[in-house]
Amino acid sequence: MIRTTRTKGGLLILAIIIGLIIGILVPVQTSVNTRLRGIVGSPFLASLLSFSIGTVFLIVLTLFVERNFSLNPGVWSEPGWIWIGGVLGVIFLTGNILLFPRIGGVQTVIMPIFGQGLMGLLIDNF
């Protein structure tokens, strides 16, 4: 029992550290993508480039970790809303690129976090 508790505690600390690192990277990503917008002249082109590079990275990562691209055939019979995650990612990324120069870095990071907290409460309660 003690050994399991230590392992779970160690994993919890690791998860917290990873969460903090991800939190640190969100404003960095927004800042980098806003700079990219200035270079290419369009928030949508900046988002497209960012997602394209991310897609290439995910392909390499998937091949390295999973060793293949096979999907469970049952995935195609799932409801259509299951595929909306990518669209929501584009809205989030492009929205941040549009907001950053208008409201600044702090509010561009804080408002989505506040929204996530509100939505998390709704999801947990309904």
Descriptions of predicted regions:
Residues 2-21, 35-38, 44, 53-81, ...:
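Membrane-interface interhelical linkers
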Residues 24-32, 72, 76-103:
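Hydrophobic alpha-helical transmembrane segments of multi-pass membrane transport proteins
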Residues 26, 42-47:
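Membrane topogenic helices and adjacent juxtamembrane segments
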Residues 39-42, 95-111:
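Structural motif at transmembrane-helix junctions in multi-pass transporters
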Residues 49, 111-112:
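Hydrophobic core positions of alpha-helical segments in small-molecule transporters
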Residues 54-58, 92, 119-120:
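Alpha-helical transmembrane segments of multipass membrane proteins
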Residues 116-126:
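C-terminal transmembrane-helix exit sites in multi-pass transporters
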